[in-house]
Amino acid sequence: SIFTKELWDKKLFNGSWQSAQDTYSVIEVATGXVLGEIGYATAQ
């Protein structure tokens, strides 16, 4: 896969991958297992 976990885990894409201060857990609905964390941005 071109999107390995190391590329996006705890990061956000703003033209390039950047570390994020805030993250959400990515949950596999069927099992409830955490697949990783994605970063998100705020206005601050």
Swiss-Prot record:
GO biological process, one term: catabolic process
Similarity-based family: Belongs to the aldehyde dehydrogenase family.
Domain of life: Bacteria
UniProt protein name: Benzaldehyde dehydrogenase [NAD(+)] II
EC nos: 1.2.1.28
Organism ancestry: Bacteria, Pseudomonadati, Pseudomonadota, Gammaproteobacteria, Moraxellales
Keywords, comma-separated and alphabetical: Aromatic hydrocarbons catabolism, NAD, Oxidoreductase
Organism: Acinetobacter guillouiae
One of the record's GO molecular function terms: benzaldehyde dehydrogenase (NAD+) activity
Catalytic activity: benzaldehyde + NAD(+) + H2O = benzoate + NADH + 2 H(+)
